[in-house]
Design a protein with these regions (language model features):
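Polytopic alpha-helical membrane proteins, predominantly small-molecule transporters/carriers
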Residues: 1-285
Length: 285
């Protein structure tokens, strides 16, 4: 039962972008709807759990949420350019690399020889995995597809910065997940409004995309519930499995066309990135 709870965040987070794409709307309507859904769920959680809230916790949570909005908006923009099945493995790999480097440099993780070996192996696996999942179709290789891939990577670098700050700022100020959840959601909505208002995102798609926001917040809730039961390392490792759902979902549910060569590359790449996530989880322990 505990392992099942720990897998739920991966299932929920891995399906968010699939819901976004399936429900429709551009990246701006999608991200705004998602943030509103997260806020609705987080308000409910706040009244049930009643975690500690102070001006410091509120400020940290809002900053974290603002940067989450930056990360999510740009991830959705990348999906529009290169698709879910390419975006999600690359995005996950970039996030793992950036948070790992930050963890080593600032929080002095990987303190033992074993953790250093596992960490370095994980980074190598991630880099190889990203290369394999981003293979182009040789028959359809045009200047436009090359240009889209380049733009997608640049957009994902900005997205990774957003996700990095979203994760790190909460840890740096030692704010618990339960306490951060509500102010984070406020920051997410504020960030969503700031990033999207020029693009006139207010339409019916915003309402439809509230559903992925509810799913995101539910994933967070199950992460907080599972961590004390299975440990941070295990819950972190299992949460990386979401890449399998989002990538395969992009191909199977959204009908993204892939050649045999690309499918093999994506399959091996996913295995490498998930393995890297497990290694990093062990290295953190």
């Amino acid at each position: 039962m505990d392992i099942f709870l720990a897998i739920l965040p991966a299932i929920f987070w891995g399906s968010i972008v699939l819901f976004n794409v399936k429900l429709g709307g551009g990246p701006y309507s999608q991200v705004l709807g998602t943030t509103i859904g997260a806020l609705i769920f987080s308000i409910g959680i706040y009244f049930v759990v009643q975690p500690e809230l102070s001006p410091r916790i509120f400020a940290v949570g809002i900053v974290s949420g603002l940067f989450w909005a930056l990360g999510q908006t740009n991830q959705l923009k990348s999906i529009k350019l290169i698709g879910v099945s390419k975006t999600m493995p690359i995005s996950t790999g970039m996030q793992l690399v950036s948070t790992s480097f930050f963890g080593v440099l600032v929080f002095h993780e990987w303190a033992t020889t074993v953790s250093i070996i596992l960490g370095v192996l994980a980074l190598i696996f991630i880099i190889v995995g990203i290369v394999l999942t981003s293979l182009e179709d040789r028959r359809q290789k045009t200047e436009e597809t090359k240009g889209n891939m380049k733009k997608g990577i640049i957009i994902l670098l900005i997205s990774t910065l957003g996700y990095l700050v979203y994760v790190v700022v909460v840890r740096f100020f030692d704010v618990s997940g339960w306490s951060a959840l509500f102010p984070q959601a406020i920051g997410m909505v504020a960030g969503g409004l700031i990033l999207t208002f020029r693009h006139k995102p207010f339409n019916f798609y915003v309402i439809k995309n509230i559903i992925p926001g509810l799913i995101w917040a539910a994933g967070n809730m199950f992460l907080f519930i599972s961590q004390p039961r299975v440990g941070v390392a295990t819950s972190f490792s299992l949460s990386q499995m979401g890449i399998v759902i989002s990538t395969l979902g992009g191909i199977i549910l959204l009908g993204e066309k892939k050649t045999k060569r690309q499918l093999i590359g994506i399959g091996i790449g996913i295995i490498l990135i998930v393995t890297a996530g497990v290694f990093l989880g062990i290295a953190k322990a």
